[in-house]
Amino acid sequence: INAYWYNAVCIVRELLKKQGEEEKAARLDALSQKIKKSFLKKFTKPDGTLYDVLPENGEPDDASKQVRCNEIFALTMPFTMIEEKQAKAILAQVRRELYTPVGLRSLSLYDPQFHPHYGGTQFERDMAYHQGTVWAYPLGAYYRACIRFSDEPKQTAKDILHQLAQLNAALAEGCLGQIAEIYDGECPAESRGCFAQAWSVAELLRAYEDAETAAAFGRNI
């Protein structure tokens, strides 16, 4: 949420500049710098990755330290508060603990509260929904961040296209040509939830566009 807020402030700042509203733009520029400084101070862990949430008192608790896929979105906005070194630390953690070929886990597989499978009673499904279940839609943001902060974006993009090709099997199960809402947190990752989820498909298409563009032109996005 903080990353989206920072991005929104920066976008409005740039729009004001285009309209010649320099004084208003300067105020938003000062605000954006304040947001960035505060965010990095409060949300950065000692290892350079990000706390997931902070309680009202601002002091990290057990929930803050859980590794979840939300931190990937801080890397993919047009305006980001995260510098390259920190971004690479975040990507390494996401790749190690959350990444699967069909999406990102909602909780690290090393967390004691990790649920590897989504199923059972309504209560059991609810307990797994955000506690390890793989969500497909964050995959687009993850791949964009991989390209953006790569030292070799062209090769990274080609690798991503190869990884995306592995999703052909997912497109052929359930509802043909669609990607499900969620998948089990452990392999084999069975599709669960909604069998044709619009945001899963949309992010898959975005990932293809990002990777094909970077592979063709060899630039970060």
Regions found by a protein language model. Give the residues of each.
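Short acidic-aromatic active-site loops that bind/stabilize oxyanions
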Residues: 1-5, 131-132
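Catalytic cores of carbohydrate-active enzymes
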Residues: 4-92, 96-118, 162, 168-201
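Alpha-solenoid helical repeat scaffolds
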Residues: 15-18, 22, 148, 152, ...
